[in-house]
Amino acid sequence: MSKGQIFHSTFSEYTDPYTGTVVKRLTDPSILSHHMYFYNRMTTSDGQYLLICQKRDEGRQLYTLNLHNGEIRQITEGDGVGQDSAMFSHDDKTIFYQQNNRFYAMDAQTLETHCFYETPEGWSGSAPGMSSDNRFMSIVETRQDTLPPRDGSAGWNFFCAYLPG
């Protein structure tokens, strides 16, 4: 699958049996999907688009989901996409995201992309956060030699490396 490819999602609704609340499912439950990190601006100002991550045939990629018609457009390709790192700019024209140790700005219409920052060698960059006026971005940089292996061998102990004491 490649950047710009279009998929379709069929929305469905059901009533939660415990609360009586109507729940609207936006994505196919057979495809692993999730939204961006909670403080990232993941919807456009007009509420038409939502940034999501999905795991399809070739791993996890970022997509825009049109909340009016269910169209899903793939916006990244390749390995190392920061699966919860994307955010819309304050004017909805740019999508910022992380891939490997690089941070990118992408034109939301044309998908033209340019790298604006790369973490130094020996460091890992993550958790980008943008100011509301898009003037400042914070990035967590951690020395790679202080991180546990990310190959799954540590299991849940991977997270213990970040606990105090």
Locations of regions flagged by a protein language model:
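Blade/loop signatures of beta-propeller domains
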Residues: 1-24
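Short, solvent-exposed coil/turn segments
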Residues: 19-21, 36, 153-156
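Short acidic/glycine-enriched loop/turn segments that link adjacent beta-strands
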Residues: 20, 58-59
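A short beta-strand motif characteristic of beta-propeller blades
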Residues: 24-32, 71-77, 112-118
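Short, contiguous, helix-prone interaction/anchoring segments in small proteins
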Residues: 27-54
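Blade-loop segments of beta-propeller domains
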Residues: 32-39, 59-103
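Asp-box/WD-like beta-propeller blade repeats and closely related beta-sheet repeat scaffolds
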Residues: 80-89, 93-165
